[in-house]
């Protein structure tokens, strides 16, 4: 017969292969009413949370004669892909069509500062490949997803549940296992299994294209321009290095629609206390990046951590 995409069937408690409901067993079925198909499910301590393409349900054990019962939780938030939900520290985090949510007894939308970046450049036709993940050591939940120009996963977006901030990047990973069973997270791509959050090298060589970049922040007040005259870096190098360094790049723009202009690139080492620069505008972006020169032995095993870097900013007129 035809398959009902909204039907849940469960087996007998004594025989996992027996799905035919009989008066002598606990097998049975339940049909969901809201949506056109069941997309995915996540098990938590007290319930199984089931997602259709439009709704969220809670399925709980109630005992005989019904065995299980389902309750409709929300009708406006379906799951975008079968693996797009994951259990985190505060509930079940999931990706829907155009937004991110958390379920912890009720469904709540997560405020997201990068929503437009993700969903304006996103391959909806490959949404079934999205998979959510947790990096519990760093209080992170995230999603690997395909951009509009790719049929495969090539990007990620992460929500830090402790800091309540978002960040994103480019990375191809098709499966992820958080630390716990193993000491470090494990992820796969191109038939390789990679350990994450360990070491600072790329298979024995210095890593390239390592950076962290801020979003735009206002340095001018309304119609005022401002100038940045110096940077006091707060960068801790994670091992003894004599020749390793990072670059702090300062970019500015005068109007929101303008392109960013790089005004200064300052090399920062463990001995740098201040870098003098000249940058003027209304908005700025600061980027900290590793030096990509693999011939420099100081860049091998170079790890660093960014703290609260300070800028010397002064008002600089109206034009």
What name fits each language-model region?
Residues 36, 76-91, 97-319:
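Beta-sheet repeat architectures centered on beta-propellers
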Residues 1-130:
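Beta-propeller and closely related beta-pinwheel folds
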């Amino acid at each position: 017969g035809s398959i009902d995409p909204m039907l849940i069937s469960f087996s007998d408690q004594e025989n996992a292969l027996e799905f035919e409901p009989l008066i002598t067993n606990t097998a049975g079925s339940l049909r969901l009413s809201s949506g056109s198909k069941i997309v995915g499910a996540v098990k938590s301590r007290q319930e199984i949370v089931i997602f259709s393409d439009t709704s969220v349900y809670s399925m709980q054990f109630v005992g005989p004669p019904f065995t299980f019962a389902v309750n409709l939780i929300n009708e406006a938030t379906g799951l975008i892909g079968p693996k797009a939900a994951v259990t985190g520290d505060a509930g079940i985090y999931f990706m829907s069509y155009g937004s991110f949510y958390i379920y912890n007894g009720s469904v709540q939308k997560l405020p997201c500062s990068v929503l437009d970046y993700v969903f304006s450049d996103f391959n909806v036709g490959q949404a079934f490949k999205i998979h959510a993940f947790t990096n519990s050591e760093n209080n992170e939940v995230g999603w690997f997803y395909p951009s509009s120009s790719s049929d495969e996963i090539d990007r990620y977006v992460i929500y830090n549940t402790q800091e309540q901030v978002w960040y994103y990047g480019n990375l191809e990973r098709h499966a992820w296992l958080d630390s716990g069973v193993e000491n470090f997270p494990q992820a796969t791509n191109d038939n390789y299994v990679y350990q994450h959050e360990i070491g600072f090298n790329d298979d024995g060589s210095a890593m390239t294209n390592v950076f962290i970049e801020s979003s735009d922040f206002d340095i001018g007040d309304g119609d005022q321009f401002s100038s940045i005259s110096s940077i006091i870096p707060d960068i801790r190098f994670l091992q003894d290095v004599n020749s390793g360094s990072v670059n702090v790049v300062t970019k500015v723009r005068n109007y929101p629609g303008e392109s960013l202009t790089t005004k200064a690139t300052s090399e920062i080492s463990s001995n740098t206390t201040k870098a003098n620069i000249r940058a003027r505008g209304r908005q700025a972006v600061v980027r900290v990046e590793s030096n990509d020169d693999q011939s420099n032995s100081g860049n091998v095993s170079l790890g660093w951590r960014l703290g609260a870097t300070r800028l010397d900013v002064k008002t600089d007129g109206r034009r």
